[in-house]
Curated annotation (Swiss-Prot):
Any single Gene Ontology cellular-component annotation: plasma membrane
The protein's name in its UniProt record: Uncharacterized protein MG350.1
Transmembrane segments: 25-45, 54-74, 91-111, 119-139, 142-162, 174-194
Membrane topology: Multi-pass membrane protein
Alphabetized UniProt keyword annotations: Cell membrane, Membrane, Transmembrane, Transmembrane helix
Length: 224
């Protein structure tokens, strides 16, 4: 092992059993965690269909200790499974899936940058949290919130420019964003706070989990 540099499993036949077993285990844990999060009701956020789902931690583990391909596969499998208990919240499932994919890619990117640092995983998850908060807050303003409101019939168009204009004029919408009367300020305040808290929780679980997996599975991940 060279410092904190992670060596991925080589694509050899005798590693296939480990790949399948570990991926299946991570998928099962991700599904269970995602399901549990649906029963955790937090005032205000639950009314907006926002859940603090931290199942992505296990998808990230698969990306590092098996492969990116396997991780993307179980991410899609987890998303499809979520439709069983989220049949009326298609946009919510797609949003969580998008957040999971961005988390996987950001952790891979920042691991390449910080792999030689002493507290590697802390830096990886810290910058992933900040990047996700910025990306998803922006997407919520431009795409996700307009689609969500259009899907449930709150607005007549998913065009974010028109939605922002209607929000600013109609005080009935202000409930969604802490009573703030400006669409973009409301988007920033709500979703930056939500995403920082959510991915902060992901980091709190992700750092010790990744360090534990790194410790106990390292020998199996070394390419000899």
């Amino acid at each position: 092992m060279n410092g904190n540099k992670l060596v991925f499993l080589p694509k050899k036949s005798y590693h296939q059993l480990f790949n399948i077993t570990f991926s299946a285990m991570m998928l099962a844990l991700a599904i269970i965690t995602s399901l549990i999060s649906e029963f955790i009701s937090i005032p205000f956020f639950s009314q907006l269909k926002l859940t603090f789902d931290i199942s992505v931690v296990f998808l990230v583990a698969c990306a590092f200790f098996v492969s990116l391909g396997w991780s993307l596969t179980i991410t899609l499998a987890s998303a499809l499974t979520s439709f069983f208990w989220n049949t009326n919240n298609v946009i919510g499932v797609l949003t969580v899936t998008l957040a999971n994919l961005s988390t996987i890619l950001f952790t891979r990117l920042y691991f390449c940058l910080f792999s030689k640092r002493r507290f590697c995983w802390i830096f990886v998850f810290l910058f992933t949290t900040l990047s996700n908060a910025l990306l998803l807050t922006t997407l919520n303003g431009i795409l996700i919130t307009p689609l969500f409101w259009y899907y449930f019939g709150y607005v007549q168009t998913p065009n974010f420019l028109i939605v922002a204009e209607q929000y600013n004029k109609n005080t009935d919408f202000h409930f969604f964003f802490f009573g703030i009367n400006n669409y973009w300020l409301g988007i920033f305040c709500l979703y930056s706070f939500f995403n920082l808290v959510k991915f902060g929780l992901v980091s709190c679980f992700g750092v010790p989990i990744m360090r534990s997996f790194q410790k106990f599975y390292w020998k199996r991940a070394l390419a000899k």
